[in-house]
Amino acid sequence: VKKPTADENVRVERLLDAQDKAAQLFDEIERREMIRGGIGEQQLSDEINALAATMFGVTRHWHRRIVRAGENTLLPFKEHPPDRAIAADDIVFLDFGPIFEEWEADFGRTYVLSDDPDKHALRDALPRVWQAGRDYFESHLDVTGAELFDFSVEAARAEGFGWGSHIAGHLVGEFPHKKIAGTATEYYIMPKSNKPMRRTDPSGRRCHWILEIHLIDPQRRFGGFYEQLLDLG
């Protein structure tokens, strides 16, 4: 087992700081009313990328930047839909993984540009399902990724929504965590991820997790997304 590269207290501090900066970025996106009708998803992504560079000097993201609007919000991360213009009454979600001084953040939120009650209902359910997942994680000390995935899907169903992804989260850490830990099923919150989530990675570091919620309303043709650190904060 390799010696961990950073003291665990420092790792926790850095991961929380990275998430705090991501939250500040998203707050500024809202304050500037950047999510607006009439622009394309890619244009908004580029504008947010420029804002992250201005605010925090961010030049890299550990995964591709995701801006999804309208029917594209039904699609999981792995899909690559054509660029879509954001409509004035759209639902939009952002999923960004900025790197702050070599530490990864992963943050996702959903925004509704109209008074549509169905879109607001889905958006408002997202943090409730996320919190239900965290509560389950906190109360089940030996929980596996597969168990938390199953619980999260059921929590979504209890709110009246479908589940839009093949995962409910993943490992996060020093960049690049995928090279440090690998991309095996056990490093995701997903079916067949059967190891206890409270464990160390191959380098001897404690595993820290992102919980991500992707709710969909297939009948009304839209979805929403919400993610942040599961075990910290």
Regions found by a protein language model. Name each.
Residues 1-233:
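Active-site neighborhoods and metal-handling regions in enzymes and metal-associated proteins
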